A protein has these predicted regions:
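Nucleic-acid nuclease catalytic cores
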Residues: 109, 137-237, 242-245, 251-263
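Glycine- and charge-rich intrinsically disordered segments
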Residues: 1-13, 18, 159-160, 248-267
Length: 267
């Protein structure tokens, strides 16, 4: 009996957010960009814990019942819970936006009504006509995958320019610079489509991060073109180097740093 040939094409598992290309694991764009230093992250995490302690002293006292170790572990989780909550809100916004673009009715939670109204204002003011919605992309040459939010025809209200752009919805504090490399990676991928149903990514002339807020929206144009994509490819290479250098944390010595030759008791 002959061995089964690898599955052709791109697949995505939402549960663990893993991509596979032609049967092999392939890193996602956001994972690749994670190799970049985020200098503000430690300050943000410390701020989350500090705000929690200052704003809810009764809850802090309750945590003391867990003992020192339990209390420390609970406080350490606060930034990541806030991140996960924000991620859930972002997913909800993406779902609403996709339905609005498809012309479907949306049943909106009351607290999110202002955000959805801001999204509608953006779609109207920029005269958005969707070309691709929530689309998976990949590159065999550079070995990466990802999921874009929107490619659409648009009209810039500030200049009147009409074109086809790639857009990314953002619901956090702002649009970060990494979004530019993210959008270029999606736009210059080799194909879009899952399970072997592969098509060229529509040509775009611009990239935009769309920050939707309850009181309005911001659209941030990003640098766009082959030279910016080349920068992403360099980051992809850096990600691969860092992965090899660090090795598998479960296997000491699997990276570039060998197993320590110990004398005495290790700390």
């Amino acid at each position: 009996m002959s061995a089964r040939s690898p599955r052709k094409g791109l697949t995505f598992s939402p549960g663990n957010h893993q991509y596979r290309l032609d049967g092999k694991h392939v890193p996602g764009v956001t994972t690749i960009l994670g190799v970049l230093d985020k200098a503000a992250l430690p300050k943000w995490a410390a701020g989350c814990v500090a705000e929690y302690v200052a704003d809810d002293p009764d809850a802090v006292e309750t945590l003391r019942s867990l003992g020192r170790k339990g209390m420390v572990n609970a406080l350490k989780e606060i930034p990541w819970k806030r991140r996960d909550d924000a991620g859930a809100r972002g997913t909800t916004l993406h779902d609403y936006a996709e339905k609005l673009l498809r012309g479907e009715e949306v049943d909106v939670d009351e607290e999110l009504v202002p955000v959805v109204e801001s999204a509608l204002d953006f779609l109207e003011e920029w005269e958005i006509e969707p070309v691709l919605l929530e689309f998976a992309v990949a590159s065999r040459e550079h070995w990466y995958a990802g999921t874009g939010d929107l490619i659409a025809r648009y009209r810039r209200p500030d200049t009147g320019h009409r074109g086809v752009g790639i857009f990314d919805w953002k619901s956090g504090k702002k649009v970060y610079p990494e979004a530019v490399w993210q959008l270029n990676a999606y736009a210059f991928a080799e194909f879009h489509g899952l399970a072997g149903d592969e098509h060229p990514v529509p040509a775009c002339d611009g990239a935009f991060g769309v920050h939707i807020r309850a009181d309005g929206f911001d659209v941030s144009p990003g640098a766009f073109g082959p030279e910016i994509f080349d920068e992403f490819v360099a980051i992809r290479r850096t990600h691969e180097i860092a992965k090899r250098g660090r090795g598998d944390w479960r296997t000491p010595g699997s990276g570039h740093l060998g197993i320590a030759i110990q004398k005495g008791t290790a700390a």
